[in-house]
Regions:
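Repeated loop/turn-to-beta-strand initiation elements of outer-membrane beta-barrel proteins
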Residues: 120-123, 159-163, 217-224, 254-261, ...
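N-terminal periplasmic/intermembrane-space "pro-region" immediately following the signal or transit peptide
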Residues: 22-87
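Residues on the lipid-exposed face of transmembrane beta-strands in outer-membrane beta-barrel proteins
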Residues: 111-115, 125, 151-155, 208-214, ...
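Outer-membrane beta-barrel translocator/receptor signature
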Residues: 78-79, 88-137, 141-149
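Flexible loop and strand-edge segments within Gram-negative outer membrane beta-barrel domains
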Residues: 132-144, 165-223, 227-243
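Surface-exposed extracellular loop regions of Gram-negative outer-membrane beta-barrel proteins
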Residues: 115-137, 260-268, 273-275, 290-321, ...
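Exposed, low-structure sequence patches enriched in small/polar residues
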Residues: 92, 97-100, 311-313, 319-323, ...
Length: 504
């Protein structure tokens, strides 16, 4: 090792020692000759090689580890369920008998007899009798009797049912509306020329009906219900009436709505003997017959939409009335209801209107003590706006309260015909009558055997031409009860109360 090398090593050692003694952060300059030596590097020869991207398939197997879960068995106590077993089809009886008895020796009897259940056809017979021996004090004999019999037959086809009905009804009433004093009874006994209908009246009604109704399962088809009813009606005095009524109800489902159309053709021919007196109550020499003929044609289109909670129906009534003179009538119709709390409360409101036929048959069925030939005039229910609330207080108690205001043009009112033989018959007059009505109905089901019901109607009337709403009650009250013994023996009791009516 030469002197230069030794000197360099010494300087390096001194420099390192000085740095250790004095710390870092100072600069030193070393002068000398530095000869770096580079060692020869041994490099590996690596070149890129292509790798096949298609990997070989390796079989994969899944093994389930057998593990047994320990689930202890536990039995819970269950409450016994109460099942109501209902037969698939309710048992039908071929016969049904109804009997009753009321005040003034008033027996009632009804008989129903039919074929019971059949897939092909159905037929039945109905007979009814109701009469009274009378007994009202200080007036004339008040006996009456109502008798009726009707039979029906219906044939079931694939998509329709076709049926017919024959009817006969006979009613007898007594004109008892006079004071039965000794002088009046003596006058009646000594009068020779007394007409047969002076103290009594008979009404005979012979009719038949036919019906064709569709039974489509597809609601998109036009469902139809067409009916024809004809009545030949007459009384003891010789008045006669023939009425033919054709009706058709059409409906079709369309995009969630129900489109409907009602058709009415009502033809009426009425003939009676002309008589003298204020209302035609005095029989005299033959004055000939007086005829009243007319045809009523009506259309009632409607559209109905029903949801889970609501029901809405909007429509109209259009009529052409050709009785005496031809007139056109239009009435709006609408109804809406909404269910609250799962049908516990259902508020509803609506408006109605229609043209009504007042026939000899309809008037004398409402008041059989009319004169021999009452005058006929059709009525118009201009409007009937109503609203109410129905629902259930509980599973046993149901109710319905309602308020309405209506007006009827040419409403029939019944007044006394003063010039009759005994002054005991009634005549009909027509007037515009407005009605404000409040009504309430309640029903109570004690159990499956006993049920009670009651209804009250309070009405306030307003007339145009007549001073009073003759023979219209200011209130009506009805209460009743029903007792059913296994649907084999049913006993009913009902009482009706009417407010004092003004007699004209």
């Amino acid at each position: 090792m030469n002197a230069m090398t030794i000197r360099a090593l010494l300087l390096t050692a001194v420099s390192i020692g000085a740095m250790a003694a004095h710390g870092q952060g100072e600069e030193y300059v070393i002068q000398g000759v530095f000869n770096p030596t580079l060692a020869d590097a041994q490099k590996k020869d690596l070149r890129p090689l292509p790798i096949d991207t298609i990997l070989p398939e390796r079989p994969v197997s899944f093994d389930v580890i057998p593990v047994k879960a320990s689930i202890p068995a536990k039995v819970d106590s269950l409450t016994a369920a109460r099942l109501n077993v209902v037969q698939p089809q309710q048992k039908l009886y071929k016969g049904f008998v109804k009997a009753g008895f009321g005040l003034y020796t008033t027996p009632l009897g009804e008989l129903y007899f039919d074929q019971a259940r059949s897939r092909d056809n159905a037929w039945g017979l109905h007979v009814k009798h109701m009469s009274s021996a009378g007994g009202i004090k200080d007036v004339g004999p008040s006996r009456y009797s109502f008798n009726s019999v009707d039979g029906y037959y219906t044939q079931f086809l694939r998509n329709h049912e076709v049926g017919g009905r024959l009817m006969y009804d006979r009613r007898r009433v007594s004109h008892y509306g006079y004071d039965a004093t000794d002088s009046v009874e003596a006058l009646i006994a000594n009068t020779v020329d007394v007409s047969e209908d002076a103290r009594k009246q008979y009404y005979n009604d012979i009719g038949f009906a036919a019906r064709v109704r569709s039974l489509y399962k597809d609601s998109t088809l036009i469902a139809h219900d067409v009916g024809l009813e004809v009545h030949a009606y007459s009384n003891l005095s010789g008045s006669k009436e023939t009425n033919m009524r054709l009706t058709a109800d059409l409906s079709k489902a369309e995009q969630g709505d129900r489109l409907g159309l009602g058709v009415l053709i009502d033809n009426n021919a009425y003939r009676g003997e002309m008589r003298n007196g204020l209302f035609g109550e005095v029989r005299s020499a033959s004055l000939g017959d007086q005829r009243t003929n007319g045809t009523l044609i009506g259309l009632t289109p409607s559209i109905t939409r029903q949801g889970d909670r609501y029901f809405v129906r909007i429509g109209a009534c259009l009529y052409i009335d050709a009785q005496g003179k031809t007139s056109f009538h239009f009435f709006p119709r609408a109804f809406a209801s909404y269910s609250l709390f799962d049908d516990i409360l259902v508020p509803y409101l609506g408006i109605e209107g229609e043209r009504r036929r007042n026939s000899f048959r309809s008037l004398t069925r409402e008041n059989p003590w009319l004169i021999a030939r009452p005058a006929l005039q059709n009525s118009s229910q201009l409007y009937d706006v109503y609203g109410g609330l129905r629902g259930n207080f509980s599973s046993r108690v149901g109710f319905d309260v309602r308020a309405s205001i209506s007006a009827t043009e040419d409403k029939p009112l019944y007044v006394s015909a003063p010039n009759g033989f005994f002054g005991d018959q009634m005549a009909v007059v027509y007037d515009r009558v407005g009605v404000f009505n409040l009504s309430g109905e309640i029903s109570y089901r004690m159990d499956e055997v006993v049920r009670f019901h009651g209804r009250i109607d309070i009405s306030q009337y307003d007339t145009d031409g007549e001073p009073e709403p003759w023979n219209l009650p200011p209130y009506q009250l009805a209460i009743g009860a029903t007792y059913s013994l296994q649907n084999k023996l049913i006993a009913s009791l009902e009482a009706q109360f009417l407010g004092a009516r003004k007699a004209g």
